[in-house]
């Protein structure tokens, strides 16, 4: 019987890909920071609405990456954030402060959750459930 090498991939009970998450961390941070900035600029000046579309695309891509590394709860939140930004863009002539606040909270929550997962090396989907369900409510989708 041999011991696993120190170079072997660390697998947890949930089987998410922790080494890949470590590698993706800087890109995830940039994506979330940009989304936050685009939302803020749109909040200050609705003529900046096209910036939201950049974040719609990048958050949709992030969602797919999170699914690929088996971080399903991150996928759900990033996907909901993308849909929320799309709704804000589509309804830019009708300000929706509740949706803006919920998307902002979701961006912040996802950033903190990624840090939590990296630090604790485990997942805790229940931490994301309240904001995912709030965004689903804003989007007229069923909760999880």
Language-model segments: residues:
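Structural secondary-structure packing elements that flank or coincide with functional cores
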Residues: 1-18, 91-144
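Extended amphipathic alpha-helical scaffold segments
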Residues: 2-6, 29-39, 63, 73-86, ...
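Long, amphipathic alpha-helical coiled-coil segments characteristic
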Residues: 12-57
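Secondary-structure edge/capping motif, primarily at the C-terminal ends of alpha-helices
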Residues: 35-46, 66-69, 85-95, 117, ...
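Solvent-exposed, non-transmembrane amphipathic alpha-helical segments
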Residues: 48, 59, 82, 86, ...
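Short, well-ordered alpha-helical segments
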Residues: 51-55, 69-84, 98-106
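Beta-strand-dominated lipid-handling architectures at cellular/organellar boundaries
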Residues: 56, 63-65
């Amino acid at each position: 019987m041999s011991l696993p090498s120190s170079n072997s991939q660390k697998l947890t009970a949930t089987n998410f890909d922790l080494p890949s998450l470590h590698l993706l961390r800087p890109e995830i941070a940039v994506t979330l920071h940009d989304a936050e900035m685009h939302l803020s600029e749109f909040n200050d000046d609705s003529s900046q609405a096209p910036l939201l579309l950049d974040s719609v695309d990048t958050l949709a891509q992030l969602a797919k990456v999170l699914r690929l590394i088996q971080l399903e709860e991150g996928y759900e939140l990033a996907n909901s954030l993308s849909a929320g930004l799309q709704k804000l863009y589509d309804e830019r002539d009708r300000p929706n402060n509740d949706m803006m606040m919920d998307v902002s909270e979701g961006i912040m929550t996802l950033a903190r959750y990624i840090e939590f997962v990296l630090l604790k090396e485990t997942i805790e989907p229940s931490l994301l459930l309240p904001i995912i369900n709030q965004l689903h409510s804003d989007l007229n989708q069923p909760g999880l």
